Amino acid sequence: MNLLPLPLGPALVAAACRKSGHNVVLLNLMFAGDTASAIQDCVEGFRPEVIGISVRNIDDQNMADPKFLMPPVREVVKTCRRLCAAPIIVGGAGYSIFPESALRYLEADMGIQGEGETAFPALLERVAMGVPVSGLPGLHLPGQRPAHRTFASNLDALPLPEPGLWIPSHREPSEFWVPVQSRRGCDLDCSFCSTAAIEGPAIRSHSPTAIAAWLEQLASSGFTNINFVDNTFNLPPDYAKELCGKIIERGLAMNFWCIVYPKWVDAELAELMARAGCREISLGFESGSDHMLVSLNKMFNTEEVKTVAKMFADAGIFRRGFLLLGGPGETRESAEESLAFADALKFEALKVTVGVRIYPETPLAATALAEGIIRPDDDLLRPRFYLAPRLGDWLPERIAAYKASRSWVM
């Protein structure tokens, strides 16, 4: 599915700043043909006292041909610096995984790790008063110890952005799958995952009523295609069922797609999701080998994957599966087992990834360090990957052949 990029994170922070009484302009550079000119026009027209830059992705997670995405962001920082003297603060999901190394690389004035809806307005207040900003939750300053992070416990206390703040008016609403997040955090602790570094390990939720009201506001503006960016839509299951029920109660004629963890799903949930407008799920089952699922610290097994996949097929929902091959303990036999398993599931689409991106402070990073794949001083900002020993020559070629013979696989 091709999505026009919309900046949910900056929009949430911008909404919080407006609620605190600040004037805000949000510039989405994904739609800017000439980035430097777009920044110059915005700076000259708005004359900002503070500039915030959101960094969502560090790289493309492609081991075969990795693309490091930070150089253009550093150019954005340099352009802003050249045009005005306003302090530059970086944040966002990608930044939050690498708060110190990314801040050094980008040469910004400071960074906010994690949620910015509370920290950024507080920072603006201190800047306006001319008092030190150190000590704000999640704040990183060059050469100083980072402040302790905090996580909002009541997400409903945080404002949700109106469409006019962040969705371009010169495009048709039908062109967008609008990102919506109803929950933050993840306690599943998969061996390679960076979600906890971004959102924290505890699951926190907006009330289903608040999310349904936001969806209704979007629908009234013509935006009926929704991308739930929750790390796992089906967890907790009772919450997912209640949210679907609220959507159904309001009669919202919407379409949505989401990520599903292949456990803790029953037929009732799959049917409710279909009735609420779910058209597609991303099912990250990662492997068809129970041995490898244990290695990746997954909480499900292959039998549960089969059951969940069938439930969504029975509900008439398009299923896009995801395989992640080459992690610790992977062998030719386990990789072949995964490919045969994926074929048997008969997904409508399948994404196969070779090699696992190594993120800081994860079990995978510890394994890679112990095996000498990374060094103790490697900050991992530039993409590094784990591929099980003795699979380097064989696995990429095997997957290329597998994809070539199956039109639904990418």
Report each predicted region and the residues it spans.
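Non-cysteine beta-strand/loop elements that form the S-adenosyl-L-methionine
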Residues: 52-55, 116, 270-288, 350-356
